[in-house]
Regions:
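Type III/flagellar secretion export determinants
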Residues: 1-199
Length: 199
């Protein structure tokens, strides 16, 4: 290799995962014409360097958002445990859920949500070994915040259905602190013990 650092942790991870072997196997199946074009575009060096970019400097696989420590391969469900998530990120998630609940009239819209940005920012704010369980926990809070808003709107207007407009002042009484005060741990999940969303 002329442009590949074979001592890097990225290269070693590439080799351990069998990706390098896959590159070599693909090369063996190329016709002479394909091999010529392959070499014109940089050959194995280019392919290996591009694949190495999928790992951080520690050799940990990066997810689609460029965050290491999020690979669950071979971990079963051991990462699905509750852990402490800072008030800052719980508040950011609550504010986002509330904004999007109002904006989308209670419907979860995967096209316009900013939740992935909050998760990524959170993940980058903690050590790699805390990212999976922290993300699991933040997702638990997110679901409970959304559920509390649904319950509040439904209590004020029993005929309301997600997608229909509603009086957004109903949610003035729904705060992160109120929702969290009703949550209890149930195994690896957060559930509501009880909630008072009287208007």
């Amino acid at each position: 290799y002329s442009g590949v650092n074979t001592n890097s942790k990225q290269y070693k991870a590439l080799k351990e995962k069998g990706w390098l072997e896959g590159v070599i196997q693909n090369e063996a199946m190329m016709s002479p014409e394909e091999k010529m074009i392959y070499e014109i575009f940089g050959g194995r060096d280019t392919i290996v360097n591009n694949l190495m970019k999928q790992f951080d400097s520690d050799g940990d696989l990066l997810n689609a958002n460029g965050v290491a420590g999020m690979d669950v391969t071979g971990k079963g469900t051991s990462w699905q445990k509750l852990t402490n998530v800072s008030e800052e990120y719980r508040q950011k998630m609550f504010d986002n859920v509330k904004k999007e609940f109002i904006q989308e009239n209670g419907v979860s819209n995967g096209d316009t949500t900013k939740r992935s940005d909050i998760f990524k920012d959170y993940q980058l704010s903690v050590n790699k070994d805390k990212r999976l369980s922290g993300t699991w926990t933040l997702e638990q809070y997110e679901g409970q915040y959304r559920s509390a808003m649904y319950v509040a709107v439904k209590a004020a207007n029993p005929n309301w259905k997600p997608g229909q407009k509603f009086d957004t002042s109903i949610l003035d009484n729904v705060t992160r602190e109120l929702v969290e005060a009703t949550l209890v741990k149930n195994g690896n999940r957060l559930v509501r013990n009880s909630i008072d969303v009287s208007v």
